[in-house]
């Protein structure tokens, strides 16, 4: 069976009259652009209009459909029961014919909160009412009106009955120790969930999107009144700063801070998705929170309110690719090394993995190289292998005991039918400690392509135009002192700007 790789769709706008088939199509096209094969309609919003499902049918996007209940408990009075029964019947009958409809889900996070008996639960009857709504009324209606479609009682859930709904070994899991729990990105590697249906990390939207709600220079600060009003999780701008100080040097300008925040988000989700794809079979779903925004805000989305793509969305295009190479490196980040301890020693190694989410076996070549900051090759390796359909395959560990963690990095690439189809780089130290050389980035436009050149290792190269609405075949990519041709999908190619992690200083 196919691994589910997707994220969650929330209402497209706080003013619903602005939403129409054109806006929905543009958003779902962005989902397909990033190689999604499914999408979750989150239960804290509303049931989308028919055109949403028509477009998903057309695009081949499987829909996980929540019923519209989330993060609350309800008193099941006779009047309320009659109301919701009609709601369930009408929506099941309205949507059941869609080829894209893959699953009905009772609610978002309610079983978990009832199980934990948290402060939202005020009286015992609410537990009884929960069972009646989500384990009797809804499944009976789904069985009667849409018996072909699977019903799942809640997300997360282990199958219902308040049986440890967030159990990592059963059902689906919402995992937030990274972000809410302030754990490092490498924490994902400690877990082997069966289906991770929600996890996320915040980032600022594009500067041009921020300028839609303020053009006052004094507001261009993560802790200004305006920025904190456009942040709906209390103190989360400080949380972004906390992760940033662990990872990067202090940005010298607000636009550089925005860029760094987007790289944090992109790398945080990448760590998770790549780990779970490497463990395909044990884990069959990686669903990050969230696709879109309903207003211009600092949030978990990969597409901001104005439709601009954050770095995460380009990363998603790569880590959701049907054929993908990834690297499980061991170094300073994975060991959580404390440089002030007497024994500041840790393993320096890589384990490469190829994930094949296609229906055919793939004959591929894997190449890796240990390089210095100028991208000169110090050591290299190559291996040919066949990766069976719908599997992931590990390569042997390679150790680098003599590597300089501050000056050496590893590049890797996956070649299929003579073309590089997936690639990346890893460091053994935090980016803030790596001795990047100035890559002296340049670019030129040739027809519908931008050719980007670097004279040294360039990490997470960003290409922006003046309006920051340029959509490219690839962006926020790594260069090994070489050049890359990037196809322009839309947007002006005048007044292009380039930067990389070297510029976070």
Where are the language model's segments positioned?
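Substrate-binding clefts and catalytic carboxylate motifs of secreted carbohydrate-active enzymes
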Residues: 104, 140-143, 152-362
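Terminal connector regions
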Residues: 394-439, 492-505
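Active-site-adjacent substrate/metal-binding segments within catalytic domains
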Residues: 1-2, 6-72, 81-103, 231-266
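Intrinsically disordered, low-complexity Pro/Gly/Ser/Thr-rich segments with frequent PxxP/GP/PP motifs
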Residues: 369-408, 468-493
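C-terminal accessory/binding modules appended to enzymatic or scaffolding proteins
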Residues: 437-481, 485-489, 501
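Active-site neighborhood of glycoside hydrolase catalytic domains
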Residues: 58, 74-164, 306-307, 311
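Short acidic, flexible loop segments centered on an aromatic residue
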Residues: 358-376, 455-471
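Buried hydrophobic-core signal for structured, non-transmembrane domains
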Residues: 350-356, 412, 448-454
